[in-house]
């Protein structure tokens, strides 16, 4: 009985001193603590399918890859279909949707602070060196984040949802660069590997690997500094300029946006069509030549009217869109080549004649100048001779008169 009583007393004291005190103290310790808001996992729903523009921005922003764009016969377009089992209810898709198609009962609360980019896994940048300024991307952008600044098109990356509608309508294969996490990680890893070899002295530097010193396209450069880390020469990122170079090509190898390069060709997406100008309808305003970014429109030396060179045409359609009289038509490449064949041959012949005329004119000018110099020299010599002879005749006449005077 005594042992049992002592045990009960011990339990009573333990509970009173330890557990009860702990619970009492817990109230006072946590009186100012605000627990975080918790939301149930409620996947978003396609609330307004009629508003969807099938931009695929929701799909691009989903971190769980739970959204697929599937064609819907009722609405005659692709609509997002969300896998509820994969969805993590992050609400990224709701944030990026430009038309408010998706809806969710509860998603993360907006907090005051710095402005962040739209959630996405890739960024799009227009390559100003390859862009032909057709304006297709600006017109196709569903949220109007592409604008023309100082003669070139620029994407506002903070507002861009990476729907890639601009890429779909761009006539050039490589004019819009996609910078994603995977590519960036690969380039950074490569740069670290080269940098470590450089620091430890294990880097084998090969000179003249590339044919000439590369240049930096300022519109593509994000100033990450990776190229500068691996460069054995000197790169000025403030001026976007390669200062010293041994032509090793390491900077080109690690650049994630292809901003540093030697040359990038313009590759048209379509080659099954081409544009041709109807000379009977053309009024010779030359607006088409002004809007053409690839230099495919030339002016005929014979007719003084514009024509399109199929080899240079990128099929952007800016010329046809801007023509005030609708004189530019879409035809097959063979027809376009046949239509301008005569004009190209004429221009080559006229250019050849003009070059010959310029050459002959230069030669004629030189010959004429030499003749004039020679004539002037001979004229001076003839003048001297005649003056000399006249002086001689006068002297002889004086001598005769003098002799006659003495004899008389």
Swiss-Prot record:
Annotated residues that bind [4Fe-4S] cluster are located at 52, 55, 58, 62, 87, 90, 93, 97, 131, 134, 137, 141, 160, 163, 166, 170, 282, 285, 288, 292
Q: Which UniProt keywords apply?
A: 4Fe-4S, Electron transport, Iron, Iron-sulfur, Metal-binding, Repeat, Transport
Keyword Electron transport (UniProt): yes
GO MF annotation: an example: 4 iron, 4 sulfur cluster binding
The record's annotation in SUPFAM superfamilies points to: 4Fe-4S ferredoxins, alpha-helical ferredoxin
Domain (4Fe-4S ferredoxin-type) spans 42-72, 78-107, 122-151, 151-181, 212-241, 233-265, 273-302, 304-333
The name this protein goes by in its record? Uncharacterized polyferredoxin-like protein MJ0514.2
- Stored InterPro entries: 4Fe4S_Fe-S-bd, 4Fe4S_Fe_S_CS, Fe-S_Ferredoxin
